[in-house]
Amino acid sequence: MSSQKRQSTLSRFFTTIKPSQSTESTLTEKVSSKSPPLPPPPPPPTASPSLPSEKLLEFGFDGTKDSTSTRTTTTKSKDVEKRKSTTSSGSSFSSESKPKRPKEKRLTPLEKQILELTEQHQDKILLIQIGYKYKVFGINALKVSKILNIMYISNDIEDTRFHYCSIPDTRLHIHLQRILSHGYKVGVVKQIESTIVKQIEKTSKSSDVMRREVTGVYTKATYLGDESNENTKGSWDGLSSSSSSSSSDVPEYIVCINEVSEKQFAIVAVQPLIGEVIFDSFKDDISRQELETRLLYLRPVEVIVITNGSSEQISGPTLMTLKLINHNCNIIHKSGSPSENGNENENENENEAIEAIMSKYLNEKLVEYYSINFSIPIQQCFEYLLLYLNEFKLTNIFTIPENITNFQDSKKYMILPANTLNSLEIFTNTTDHTTKGSLFKLLNNTKTIFGSRLLQKWVSRPLVHIQDIKDRHQAIEDLQSEYNHVVDSISNFLTKIKYLDLEGLLSKIHYSSTNNNNNNLRINRKQVYLLLSNLQEILILVQKFEKSIKSFKFKSSLLIQIFDELLTISQTDIIIIENFLSMIDLSFIDCKESSEQCRKFFKRNSFDSIELQYQNIAQYQQQIEQEQLEIIRKELGNSKLKYVQKDGERYLIEIRNNQRDKLSKILDDKDYILIKSTQTITRYRKKSVTEYLKLLQYHEEMLIKTCDEEFQNFLKDLDSNYTLFYKIIKNLAIFDCLLSLTTTSSLPNYTRPTLIDDDLTILVKQARHPTIEQLRPNYVANDININIEYDKNRVLIITGPNMGGKSSYVKTVALLTVMTQIGCYLPCQNATMGIFDSIFIRMGANDNILKGYSTFMMEMLQCKNIISMMSNRSLIILDEIGRGTGTIDGISLAYSILKYLIESEFKPLVLFITHYPSIHVLEQEYPNQLVVNYHMGYQEIKNNTPGEIPEIIFLYNLCRGVVNNSYGLNVAKLAGISHDIIKQAYRVSEKVKSDIELKEYWKFAHSLNKALKEGGSSSPNQLDDIDYYILSKHSSL
């Protein structure tokens, strides 16, 4: 560039250009005619560079059109007007002149479409398919770019609505999960028409933008891996919804809570992955302990809370409980019922209104089923869940009544309260909240995802019917007894499918069967084939061992039922699975492109509609490859000419450049279209071939569409056999759980407990804590001797030094009870166990800041719940009741609560840990060893150095009697507290102890002296004081 040109260019940016008089006067007239005169301009500042957007305007680029076309249409006068309007100072505008307003940007059809979609779906992040990418626009693009750590692109466009970030379409499934994990609702927008179909069918103008629609809406709990690519590993392996989730992951529920009143609640929870529906009605108080228990089981990620019409917000205790369980939980508040019609007090009208809404999503038979079997509060939960799940196309989760279960069924199993789950570390430990050291981790040796899911239910719901427990124990004994090749073969099969969630795949088929949108099927072809082929394989395996199964000598009715059902299905219904598989062409597995998999999934001649499209394709292929090729050969005088395919372009002919001049006239006259030219060859396509090729491509698109439609019908046929497939999977899951319990029960020194249904006996020889012994060697075993056949040893008061093993002992008792009723063997020499229907534990010192409760308040609320919910088959464990308040009040409450439990008509079994020695006198108040004092063994080593505390050695064994000293100073020493502080504390402790003892001696001496003087006329109170002193001194010895 010459210096003159460079100077000219720079002056356009940095120098104020004075327009000619004629141009200025014309511009002034135009501006003045449209707007009132402007005030005189301010004094001109020093010249400054234009903004980047202004520079672009000066060069004729407005950001919406191609820069070349813009420059061509921009005249000199327009260029001057732009410069004048963007120049900040230095121009000689008159007082009447005003800069012309910038011309409004014209939106392209695609931009208009993006804005329309964004306007219609403001509550979600939209991933819009444009070419081979999915793009996010506007403010949502900024959020997504931060989540995915990808580039946020503005392209110097001032309109932030079109700033974007993008991801490849092949990575949609992976990135979508990452966005959903942050709690967002996401809509996937796909292009639902192709260029060729648009041209042939002429559904819209050729200039119109491609039609796009929201084909799927997802949240964390409702995404089932729908957008996984056919060729991804997760898709082939058939993993559950998250594809990367492990079998130990907590299920993700969507929960609807109905706050009927301050104390009455209804709840319905759905797990979309497996189609499970759980309901319950219950009473609760301000502590929301019952609600917390249910939420702890369900671990919801999305919650709908219904409040009555008079309440405009969720109650504080309910909201705090939800945040306590999952602070990232998405909470939606709904006031009243969507079916309210002004007669909300009339149940009949309310019922009719609910039925009207349900009938939009369910058939008449199902609506009647829900109306008859569930109360109105439960029906309202169903109603709101139907409305909520409709957006995600999951309403048919309510179409299988067999999947609907009650949260609590006292005749079958017990529900462990939230405090019990946490204190016993059933699913997670209390240290880092992982599964390490938990009971579930010990018991979970399952081989499959669906087996682990069922075992989690078994662990959280111990059985209460003695025969059901015996069946599981007997199944373990049968599986342990001797090697069985049938059991081993099925076990190997389960290991083979450890990453395949058959239960989840079956649910996906059910959802997809009613989804009319082929762009958003919940399951892909490979997953369908995996499900069917593995179901066939297990049935063939059972058929193979038919004689062995019939000759089984199993005593367990549970095992007999599993093998009998599988054998019956293999003999009568395997033909159904074989018929489905006979329609599938296995060559589709090797296809790399999803469109090719679609075409080759079904065998030829399986469907007339597909064959019709194949015939049309063959017809046009023949036209192009035979008739048109023959014409081309004659025209170009080359009998050996063949089509070539390059860069995805089909049916091209290649002509060397040195022959092109000779054939130029023929190529022009015969309508040959130039496709591409290189240094050596030029590629053409004849115009008539192009027309036939369009028709061929159209029918290829129609073939894919037809294959998708037939695949949809195929899924409907599969879904009609849902019950059959579910029965096979359920039996496999039960067998997997029994194998898992057998593995744990085969650990060293585990034994089958003897069950007693008559009383609450717990007699265990050399009992060990099941999880601690796995983490620590040389665990000290203890005997458990609780036999209340004659109302003896029903209440155990346990004292002892800190860190002596008191909590470990009572947890061992509770865990052995839970393991027994789950159906597992116990870590001990031998055991005789009674059957409990509830286990309550009050342990630990935890406040609840979210609920606004202090440590002591939480302690008292938990005690109140235990007292109100206990039964005649309850195991109650109380740890240091009353320690959260003053000593006098604490002792008084501990004494009164324990005495109430002793005298209760329910007569529960109670283990009471305390550091209050005075409570031990209850042993003397109740005869026949109803209350017994125990302590954890230790050995005290006296220290001859004055002022030094004695050393103690913890023995961790349970001994009869009471201990007055908790040896807290020794624990402080172990914790590393300064030696000087401990010495000072020891001196104070000894002085206080001697003062108390001296006071007790004087009180005793005074009472004894008065009694001796008065002889037989002593008052009962005086005699009680003497008895109390003598008994306390005797017990301490």
From Swiss-Prot:
Keywords for this protein: ATP-binding, DNA damage, DNA repair, DNA-binding, Nucleotide-binding, Nucleus
Major subcellular site: nucleus
UniProt binding sites for ATP: 800-807
Keyword DNA damage appears in the UniProt entry: yes
Pfam families attached to this UniProt entry: MutS_I, MutS_II, MutS_III, MutS_V
Location of the region described as Mispair-binding domain in the Swiss-Prot/TrEMBL record: 102-221
Alphabetical GO biological process terms: mismatch repair; mitotic recombination
One Gene Ontology term of the molecular function aspect: mismatched DNA binding
Annotated Pro residues bias: 36-47
Cellular compartment(s): Nucleus
Listed InterPro entries: DNA_mismatch_repair_MutS-lik_N, DNA_mismatch_repair_MutS/MSH, DNA_mismatch_repair_MutS_C, DNA_mismatch_repair_MutS_core, DNA_mismatch_repair_MutS_N, DNA_mismatch_repair_MutS_sf, DNA_mmatch_repair_MutS_con_dom, MutS
Bias type Polar residues, positions: 1-30
Region (Disordered): 1-107, 229-249
GO CC, one annotated term: nucleus
Record note on quaternary structure: Heterodimer consisting of MSH2-MSH3 (MutS beta). Forms a ternary complex with MutL alpha (MLH1-PMS1).
Family membership noted in the UniProt record: Belongs to the DNA mismatch repair MutS family. MSH3 subfamily.
Protein purpose: Component of the post-replicative DNA mismatch repair system (MMR). Heterodimerizes with MSH2 to form MutS beta, which binds to DNA mismatches thereby initiating DNA repair. MSH3 provides substrate-binding and substrate specificity to the complex. When bound, the MutS beta heterodimer bends the DNA helix and shields approximately 20 base pairs. Acts mainly to repair insertion-deletion loops (IDLs) from 2 to 13 nucleotides in size, but can also repair base-base and single insertion-deletion mismatches that occur during replication.
Listed name of the protein: DNA mismatch repair protein MSH3
Source organism: Candida albicans (strain SC5314 / ATCC MYA-2876)
